[in-house]
Design a protein with these regions (language model features):
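Extended catalytic cores of very large enzyme megasubunits
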Residues: 1-169
Length: 169
């Protein structure tokens, strides 16, 4: 029934004379696995929200305004059932000078913990929890610490295990 409902909802605004043809063709394609439907569409298309985005990329810059805006965007997209990609490679590394050395940067780990918490705070309509992959360039100042963030050794202070990571070469 799910595939028929998805097909009907997708084409509900099409002209009546063509709608049933499109519904049947789409149903045939998805029910025989000729095409695959992403989870957000499968889980949410039949709800009033109708989220079509499967994944989004949130690009965070180095300023606090950008980091906190990125965190807000992450929360909103997770609540809309989207998988999250986070480009966090421009966030300065631990000990970097801020305002001419007046302050030293806390590094990426505290901000990753914030992103992790935001991703985990919303379930996607009870179907699954939120998920995110964080992207870093291989030349990032903290790359050695980033590479072991999911490692089972270490303490919760220096691990962020519930995010996934990719390294950009």
């Amino acid at each position: 029934y799910m595939y028929m409902l998805i097909s009907a909802v997708l084409f509900k605004n099409y002209p009546k004379e063509k709608r049933l043809t499109y519904v049947k063709r789409y149903y045939e394609a998805v029910s025989t696995f000729k095409i695959n439907i992403p989870t957000p569409i499968m889980a949410g298309l039949r709800t009033p929200l109708r989220q079509f985005a499967s994944c989004v990329l949130v690009d965070s810059d180095d300023s606090l305004d950008s980091i906190f805006s990125s965190d807000m965007a992450i929360g909103r997209y997770v609540a809309q059932r989207a998988g999250i990609g986070i480009n966090a490679g421009r966030i300065r590394g631990l000990g970097s000078k801020i305002r001419g050395g007046e302050v030293q940067h806390t590094g990426v780990i505290p901000f990753l913990k914030k992103f992790e918490s935001t991703v985990r705070c919303c379930t996607q309509n009870g179907v699954r929890g939120g998920s995110a992959t964080v992207h870093f360039p291989i030349w990032h100042q903290e790359i050695e610490d980033i590479l072991v963030l999911k490692n089972n050794k270490g303490t919760e202070d220096n691990r962020v295990r519930k995010l996934d990571y990719s390294i950009q070469i």
